[in-house]
C-alpha cells in the first residue's frame, strides 16, 4: 500500500484519488479478484489519458480471453495513434501479470491492484466520454446535414416542376379536389388565381427523372461517413441514414402512376358495351320488361373500334366522379388519358341506339330530371332540343317493351260477318241442343228447322257482342231483307259443329292493346308511414295518371293520400327557402302546383310555396355552355349569382359562369 501511494504521488495525481484507489484495490484483493499491475507503470510514464484508457481496455479484454485486435481498432481511431503501442503493451503485460498475481501471495496482490484501480478508473471514464462524444457527433452531424440538403434540393425541384402558367396547366383530378387528394396523385396544387385549375400535372417527366438521379447519388455519401466509426452510436447513425434511400425509392411510384393511366386507356376499349344492344332483346323475348337483372349481370366484350372516336364527339355516359368499374358495368367506354374531356362515354352502337326522333321519344324519367339521374336509369339524355322529352328510352329498349306484351291477355279477336252476296248453296246445319242459347230475331218468318235456302238477296247489318272466353255467345241479329220468298235465319251457338261450303267475305277485327312504358318505383321507395306521405296528385287522380308522374300509388288505406311522392322525390324537394326558384304564381294552389310537376310547401311563410325541385333546378342549368346568357357581371360571386335566381358553373372556361336558367 505505501508503494502504491508513492507511485501515485510521483505521477502528480491527486492524493484523494490515490486513497480512493487504494481502498478499492484492497477490497478487490479481499474479494479474490485478479488485476493487471502493469497499468500503473503505463500511467506513470506520463502518456496521454487516451492512451492509458486504451491500454486499460486492452488489459480487460485480455483478462476476459478476447482477442486484442477488436479493442485496438476503436482505440486507434479515437486517439489517432498508431495501433502498435496499444497492441504491444496491452496483451503482453496482461498475459504476464494476470496469472502471476492470481497464484501469488496476498501482499503482492494488495500492493499491485492499488495503482491499477486508480490509473484505470479516471482515464477510462474520460476516454470513453471523449470517444463516445466524438464518435456520435461526427456521423450524426453529417447525416443531418445530408438530410437538410436533400430537403432543400427536393423542395426547390418541386417548385421548379410545379411552376406552370395557369394557361398551360393540365387538370389533374376532378373539380373541387383537395390538396391532400391532389398530392396523392403526385400532382401540383396551387389555389391561387380566380377560376383557374388548382390541381394540375407537373412539367415534362424528363426533369423529374434527373431529380431522382441526383438524390440517389447523394445518399451513399452519407452512409460512407457513418461506416468509418465502429461504436454502437455509429450503428444507430447508419440506421438513420437508411431512410434517405427509402425516400429515393418512394419517388419511383410517380412513374408507375403515370404508366397506370396509360394502361387504363387501352384496357376499357375491350371490355363491355354491346351488353345493351345484344342482351336486351334476349331478355325481353323470354321474360317481361321488369326483368333487368340479366341485363346487369351479362357482360359482352366489345371490339376496340366501338370506343374509337374524336374526344369532342364523346357522349357522356356517367356522372360526376364515376369510377372506371362503375362506368364499365354500365357497358360504356372509359378513357382518362385526355384531360378536360369526357372519360366515361357511350360506344358507337349506343350513340346510334339513342338517335330517336323527338316525336317518337318515350319518356324515361320525370319533368326536370337531371342528366345524372337519367343515366343512372340507363336511359338516353338529350337536352339540345327544347319542348321535347330529354330523358327517354333507346330504340332497343322500346322494341324490347313491345316484344314483351303478351297477346293472350290483351288481344280479343272479334269476327263480324257482313254478307253481301246472292248464295245458292245447300247448307247442312247440325244444331246441338243447349240450354244457354238465346235467339232474338226480328223477321217476317222465324223458323228453327234445317231448310234449304232458295236464292235470296240479303243485306245484313249485325251487331255482335262476344265476350273473350265465353263458349256460347248470345247473338242479336236485325235483318232487313227484300225478298219474294220467306227468309229463313238460322242461329247457331258457338259450340255447334258446322260443315258448310260458303263463299262469304269475312272481315276480322283484332284489338291490340299497347302498354305505354311508365316510370316504375321500387317497393322500398314507397315504404313510409301513411301520415308522412306527401301528396303527389290531385282529387280524382287515377293510378295510371299517378304512376305516369313517377309517384307511388296505394289505395289500400282509407282516409290517406293514395298518390304520394317516393322517398327520393321527397328528398329532391328538400330545398332551402332562400334557394327556391318559383314554379307558379301568387296564390297558386297545391293541386295547380302539382299539375306542373313542381314541389309545394306552404309551411314557411314569406317564401315561395310552389318551387322547382333540386333536380329540376339542375336540369335548367345543364344546357350547352355555348348557349349560356350572362346573368351577372365580371367578378360576381357564386352567392350573389344564386340569390338572383341564376345558375353558377365555373368549370368551363371562356363562357359565362353566372347565367340564366333555360
Swiss-Prot record:
Record domain P-type: where: 160-203, 305-348, 352-395, 524-567, 571-614, 619-662
Biased composition (Low complexity): 122-146
Tissue specificity: Skin.
Region ranges (8 X approximate tandem repeats, Thr-rich): 218-301
Keywords, comma-separated and alphabetical: Disulfide bond, Glycoprotein, Repeat, Secreted
InterPro entries per the UniProt record, alphabetical: P_trefoil_chordata, P_trefoil_CS, P_trefoil_dom, P_trefoil_dom_sf
Biased composition (Basic and acidic residues): 147-170
Sequence repeats: 81-88, 89-96, 97-104, 105-112, 113-120, 121-128, 129-136, 137-144, 218-224, 225-239, 240-249, 250-259, 260-275, 276-287, 288-294, 295-301, 402-411, 412-419, 420-431, 432-443, 444-453, 454-460, 461-472, 473-479, 480-491, 492-498, 499-515, 516-522
Gene Ontology annotations of biological process type: maintenance of gastrointestinal epithelium
Family matches, as PROSITE patterns: P_TREFOIL_1, P_TREFOIL_2
Subcellular location: Secreted
Cellular component terms (Gene Ontology): extracellular space
Region (8 X 8 AA approximate tandem repeats, Ala/Thr-rich): 81-144
Disulphides: 162-188, 172-187, 182-199, 307-333, 317-332, 327-344, 354-380, 364-379, 374-391, 526-552, 536-551, 546-563, 573-599, 583-598, 593-610, 621-647, 631-646, 641-658
Entries under SUPFAM superfamilies matching the protein: Trefoil
Region (Disordered): 27-109, 122-170, 231-297, 404-516
Pfam families associated with the record: Trefoil (PF00088)
Annotated segments matching region 12 X approximate tandem repeats, Thr-rich: 402-522
Gene3D superfamilies assigned to the protein according to its UniProt record, in alphabetical order: Spasmolytic Protein, domain 1 (4.10.110.10)
Protein name: Integumentary mucin C.1
Organism the protein comes from: Xenopus laevis
Amino acid at each position: 500500500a505505501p508503494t502504491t501511494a508513492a507511485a501515485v504521488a510521483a505521477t502528480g495525481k491527486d492524493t484523494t484519488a490515490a486513497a480512493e484507489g487504494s481502498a478499492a484495490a484492497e477490497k478487490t484483493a479481499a474479494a479474490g479478484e485478479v488485476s493487471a499491475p502493469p497499468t500503473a507503470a503505463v500511467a506513470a510514464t506520463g502518456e496521454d489519458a487516451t492512451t492509458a484508457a486504451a491500454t486499460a481496455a486492452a488489459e480487460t479484454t485480455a483478462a476476459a480471453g478476447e482477442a486484442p485486435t477488436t479493442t485496438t481498432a476503436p482505440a486507434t481511431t479515437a486517439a489517432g495513434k498508431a495501433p502498435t503501442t496499444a497492441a504491444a503493451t496491452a496483451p503482453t503485460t496482461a498475459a504476464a501479470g494476470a496469472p502471476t498475481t492470481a497464484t501469488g501471495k496476498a501482499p503482492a496482490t494488495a500492493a499491485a491492484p492499488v495503482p491499477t484501480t486508480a490509473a484505470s478508473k479516471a482515464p477510462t471514464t474520460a476516454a470513453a466520454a471523449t470517444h463516445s462524444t466524438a464518435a456520435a457527433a461526427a456521423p450524426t452531424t453529417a447525416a443531418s446535414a445530408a438530410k437538410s440538403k436533400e430537403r432543400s434540393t427536393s423542395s426547390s425541384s418541386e417548385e421548379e416542376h410545379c411552376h406552370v402558367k395557369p394557361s398551360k396547366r393540365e387538370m389533374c383530378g376532378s373539380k373541387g379536389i383537395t390538396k391532400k387528394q391532389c398530392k396523392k396523385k403526385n400532382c401540383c396544387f396551387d389555389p391561387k388565381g380566380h377560376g383557374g385549375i388548382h390541381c394540375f400535372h407537373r412539367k415534362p417527366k424528363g426533369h423529374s427523372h434527373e431529380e431522382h438521379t441526383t438524390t440517389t447519388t447523394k445518399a451513399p455519401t452519407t452512409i460512407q461517413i457513418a461506416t468509418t466509426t465502429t461504436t454502437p452510436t455509429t450503428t444507430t447513425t447508419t440506421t438513420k441514414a437508411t431512410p434517405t434511400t427509402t425516400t429515393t425509392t418512394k419517388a419511383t411510384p410517380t412513374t408507375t402512376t403515370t404508366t397506370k393511366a396509360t394502361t387504363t386507356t387501352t384496357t376499357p376499349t375491350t371490355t363491355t358495351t354491346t351488353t345493351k344492344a345484344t342482351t336486351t332483346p334476349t331478355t325481353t323475348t323470354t321474360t317481361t320488361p321488369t326483368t333487368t337483372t340479366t341485363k346487369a349481370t351479362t357482360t359482352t366484350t366489345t371490339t376496340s373500334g366501338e370506343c374509337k372516336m374524336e374526344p369532342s364527339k364523346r357522349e357522356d355516359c356517367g356522372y360526376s366522379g364515376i369510377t372506371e368499374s362503375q362506368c364499365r358495368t354500365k357497358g360504356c367506354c372509359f378513357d382518362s388519358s385526355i384531360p378536360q374531356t369526357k372519360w366515361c362515354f357511350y360506344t358507337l352502337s349506343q350513340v346510334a341506339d339513342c338517335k330517336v326522333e323527338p316525336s317518337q321519344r318515350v319518356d324515361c324519367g320525370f319533368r326536370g330530371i337531371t342528366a345524372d339521374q337519367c343515366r343512372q336509369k340507363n336511359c338516353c339524355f338529350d337536352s339540345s332540343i327544347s319542348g321535347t322529352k330529354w330523358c327517354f328510352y333507346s330504340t332497343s329498349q322500346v322494341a324490347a317493351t313491345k316484344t314483351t306484351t303478351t297477346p293472350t291477355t290483351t288481344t280479343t279477336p272479334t269476327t263480324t260477318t257482313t254478307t253481301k252476296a246472292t248464295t245458292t248453296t245447300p247448307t247442312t246445319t247440325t244444331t246441338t241442343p243447349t240450354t244457354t242459347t238465346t235467339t232474338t230475331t226480328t223477321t217476317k218468318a222465324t223458323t228453327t228447322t234445317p231448310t234449304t235456302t232458295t236464292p235470296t238477296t240479303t243485306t245484313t247489318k249485325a251487331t255482335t257482342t262476344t265476350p273473350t272466353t265465353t263458349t256460347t255467345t248470345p247473338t242479336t241479329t236485325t235483318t232487313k231483307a227484300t225478298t219474294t220468298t220467306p227468309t229463313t235465319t238460322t242461329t247457331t251457338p258457338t259450340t255447334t259443329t258446322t260443315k258448310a261450303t260458303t263463299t262469304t267475305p269475312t272481315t276480322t277485327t283484332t284489338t291490340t292493346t299497347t302498354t305505354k312504358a311508365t316510370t316504375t318505383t321500387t317497393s322500398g321507395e314507397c315504404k313510409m308511414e301513411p301520415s308522412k306521405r306527401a301528396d303527389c296528385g290531385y282529387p280524382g287522380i287515377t293510378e295510371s295518371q299517378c304512376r305516369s308522374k313517377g309517384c307511388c300509388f296505394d289505395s289500400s288505406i282509407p282516409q290517406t293520400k293514395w298518390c304520394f311522392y317516393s322517398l327520393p322525390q321527397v328528398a329532391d324537394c328538400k330545398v332551402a327557402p332562400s334557394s327556391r326558384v318559383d314554379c307558379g304564381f301568387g296564390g297558386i294552389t297545391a293541386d295547380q302546383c302539382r299539375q306542373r310537376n313542381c314541389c309545394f310547401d306552404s309551411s314557411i311563410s314569406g317564401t315561395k310555396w310552389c318551387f322547382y325541385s333540386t333536380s329540376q333546378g339542375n336540369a335548367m342549368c345543364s344546357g350547352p355552355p355555348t348557349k349560356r346568357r350572362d346573368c351577372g357581371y365580371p367578378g360576381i360571386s357564386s352567392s350573389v349569382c344564386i340569390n338572383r335566381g341564376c345558375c353558377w358553373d365555373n368549370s368551363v372556361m371562356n363562357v359565362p359562369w353566372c347565367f340564366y336558367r333555360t
